[in-house]
Each structure stands twice: as C-alpha cells, then as structure tokens.
C-alpha cells in the first residue's frame, strides 16, 4: 500500500473521525485531529494515534485538553480544542484520511500551543 502522507507527531490533519473508540469504520464528520504517534503493523499497514479536535467550547478546557487559536495557526478556520483523553489508533487509508480524493495535512502544532499541549499530555499520563 502506498502511504497517503508522511505522518509526524504534532501534525494537524483532517480525518473522518469515528464517533466512538470502538468503531471500526470512518465517522460521518471530517474533522481536525492532532497526530501523536505512528506505528507500522505486522501486515505493513501504517497507523497513527490521533487526538480528537473540535471547534466547540474552545473557551474552556477540561483536563487533558488544550486549544489552538486560529490566529496562531493560519491553517485553522476556527479555534480548535484538542482532547488528548479522546484518542485512537487509525489506519492511514483513503477511507479515513481523504476527502474528494485528497489528503489534508493542515500544518504543525504552533509553538504558542506547545505549553498547553505538554500540560494536557501530562494530565492524561502521556508525558
């Protein structure tokens, strides 16, 4: 299988995020996620650990969450809250990562968001 993109931790990409962590199929909404890690399965499939992103309720963050402001990341249309406590492994496939035949790698986590990301990671035991 050809990889759709070269994932790297800290990348913000668009995916068809499943609605539950137990779902085995892409979800109905194409949304931003933060890539946390990558892994190659024994069968050769590339998978990435992603954290859920939403533009809802960005003015308050629960433990394990941080917000990236669109003024700090021009590639985001709206402020986006990333929830590190809502993460899952997804295969890097067209079904999850493409819309209209294109993969959308938006950009990298901006420097101004690193402190918030580190705090959120610590709160959920990732650091």
Language model: regions and residue ranges:
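Compact nucleic-acid interaction/catalytic patches
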Residues: 22-30, 35-72
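C-terminal terminal-subdomain/extension
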Residues: 70-127
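Short, surface-exposed secondary-structure edge patches
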Residues: 2-6
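Generic detector of intrinsically disordered, low-complexity, polar/charged segments
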Residues: 7, 24, 41, 61, ...
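Loop/turn positions that initiate beta-strands
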Residues: 9-12
């Amino acid at each position: 299988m050809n990889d759709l993109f070269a994932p790297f931790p800290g990348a913000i990409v668009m995916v068809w995020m499943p609605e539950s962590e137990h779902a085995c199929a892409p979800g109905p909404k194409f949304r931003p996620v933060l890539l946390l890690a990558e892994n190659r399965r024994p069968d050769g499939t590339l998978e990435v650990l992603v954290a859920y992103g939403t533009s809802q309720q960005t003015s308050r963050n629960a433990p394990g969450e941080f917000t990236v402001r669109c003024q700090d990341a021009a590639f985001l249309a709206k402020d986006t809250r990333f929830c590190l406590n809502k993460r899952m492994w997804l295969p890097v496939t067209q079904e999850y990562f493409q819309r209209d035949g294109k993969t959308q790698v938006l950009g990298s986590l901006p420097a101004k968001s690193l402190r918030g990301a580190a705090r959120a990671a610590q709160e959920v035991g990732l650091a």
